[in-house]
Amino acid sequence: MKYIGAHVSAAGGLANAAIRAVEIDATAFALFTKNQRQWRAAPLTTQTIDEFKAACEKYHYTSAQILPHDSYLINLGHPVTEALEKSRDAFIDEMQRCEQLGLSLLNFHPGSHLMQISEEDCLARIAESINIALDKTQGVTAVIENTAGQGSNLGFKFEHLAAIIDGVEDKFRVGVCIDTCHAFAAGYDLRTPAECEKTFADFARIVGFKYLRGMHLNDAKSTFGSRVDRHHSLGEGNIGHDAFRWIMQDDRFDGIPLILETINPDIWAEEIAWLKAQQTEKAVA
């Protein structure tokens, strides 16, 4: 079964994220559990936790259908010790918030070397950051998102994801989220079913589908291999509709949150309905 949704706003209270997901007929959703552009946030109150859990139960969202995202400020591979520790502390807090909310996944961008350390050193720092966070939490899986490779961001190669996983001690609590726009911008073609087959055969060989814990379904304003992260509405960008239809018809993508981060929230309900309709092999438009 496909879980399909979008990254919805939690403005006004975390419980509102579930309500907004229902409003677009989503069977999955993503959210920030705190302001994603601030380092610190007030601790979750018992009321906030209870209201969120009640809303999820009311609208039938289990933790398998929810993919929280951490702060954009966090860099788990930071080359400077003091800044690395700050990021690690913030990541642990994000993981603990998920644990309190009964959520089993936390999606995050792996990190950047900032042109100051080697890729290998940065990837090792990211893996160690995950180990530290897993040691201080229970029941939450760290879900590494592939990147477009802008600037000095790592995670744009499947080999980067595999290297991080290799350095994580608890393999049961680490996974990956594949963003289609990021993959395309990083040089993984998705424009035809044949290219999708090739790209995900590479993914299966290098990383492994057992680690796939979520996806971000985004078309791309950016061009193929450009290393530029620019999302677009489904079918409106340089990837086109075929990739998303292909994903909907492949059962390897069942049972994980498939999340839209496309640029026009006003048509998320339409995009979700279209994705749901593609699950039959007869779907061609």
Curated annotation (Swiss-Prot):
Biological process terms in GO annotation: base-excision repair
Enzyme Commission number, as recorded: 3.1.21.2
Positions contributing to Zn(2+) 1 binding: 69, 109, 145
InterPro entries per record: AP_endonuc_2, AP_endonuc_F2_Zn_BS, Xyl_isomerase-like_sf, Xyl_isomerase-like_TIM-brl
Known catalytic reactions: Endonucleolytic cleavage to 5'-phosphooligonucleotide end-products
Cofactor(s) this protein cannot do without: Zn(2+)
The organism's place on the tree of life at top rank: Bacteria
The keyword Oxidoreductase is annotated on this UniProt entry: no
GO molecular function terms attached to this record: deoxyribonuclease IV (phage-T4-induced) activity; DNA binding; DNA-(apurinic or apyrimidinic site) endonuclease activity; phosphoric diester hydrolase activity; zinc ion binding
Cofactor info, note text: Binds 3 Zn(2+) ions.
CDD domains from the UniProt entry: AP2Ec (cd00019)
Top-level enzyme category: hydrolase
Coiled coil: none
Residue numbers binding Zn(2+) 2: 145, 179, 216, 261
Binding site for Zn(2+) 3: 182, 229, 231
Keyword match Transport: no
Keywords: DNA damage, DNA repair, Endonuclease, Hydrolase, Metal-binding, Nuclease, Zinc
PANTHER family cross-referenced by the UniProt entry: APURINIC-APYRIMIDINIC ENDONUCLEASE, ENDONUCLEASE IV ENDODEOXYRIBONUCLEASE IV
Similarity comment: Belongs to the AP endonuclease 2 family.
Function: Endonuclease IV plays a role in DNA repair. It cleaves phosphodiester bonds at apurinic or apyrimidinic (AP) sites, generating a 3'-hydroxyl group and a 5'-terminal sugar phosphate.
The name this protein goes by in its record: Probable endonuclease 4
Gene name of this polypeptide: nfo
